[in-house]
Every structure is written in structure tokens, then in C-alpha cells.
Curated annotation (Swiss-Prot):
Name of the protein described by the UniProt record: Cold shock-like protein
UniProt subcellular location: Cytoplasm
Phylogenetic placement of the source organism: Bacteria, Thermotogati, Thermotogota, Thermotogae, Thermotogales
The keyword Metal-binding is annotated on this UniProt entry: no
Domain CSD: from-to ranges: 3-62
Length: 66
């Protein structure tokens, strides 16, 4: 699945991704697959999966595409 980062607060370690087909999904820093400090920037295109979390659907296996 693809989407764009709506916002991400690196101090709090979470944010939201807007899915290409519509709707937002929660993303936690621990779901980001990259080396070093795991953070996202507004507008970045990402690929991800959706898993059921404690508080509902959330992004998993998040990879930056652009």
C-alpha cells in the first residue's frame, strides 16, 4: 500500500500517513524501516502494510519511496 506522510512528530515518535485511496492511518517510529534515527517528513511517499494495533489500524513495515 502507498501513501504520503501527513505529519510526523519526531519528538513524540508518531504521526499519520494519508493512504492513496483515502483515509489516514497512525504510524509509530518503531514501524519505520530505515537505518539510524527513524523519522518521517511531511509529504514523503511511503509504502507500508496495515496491522491491527491496540487502538485500531496502524502502519507497519514503513519504507520511504521518495
Amino acid at each position: 500500500m502507498r501513501g504520503k506522510v501527513k505529519w510526523f512528530d519526531s519528538k513524540k515518535g508518531y504521526g499519520f500517513i494519508t493512504k492513496d485511496e483515502g483515509g489516514d492511518v497512525f504510524v509509530h517510529w518503531s514501524a519505520i524501516e530505515m537505518e539510524g534515527f527513524k523519522t518521517l517528513k511531511e509529504g514523503q511517499v511511503v509504502e507500508f502494510e496495515i496491522q491491527e494495533g491496540k487502538k485500531g489500524p496502524q502502519a507497519a513495515h514503513v519504507k520511504v519511496v521518495e
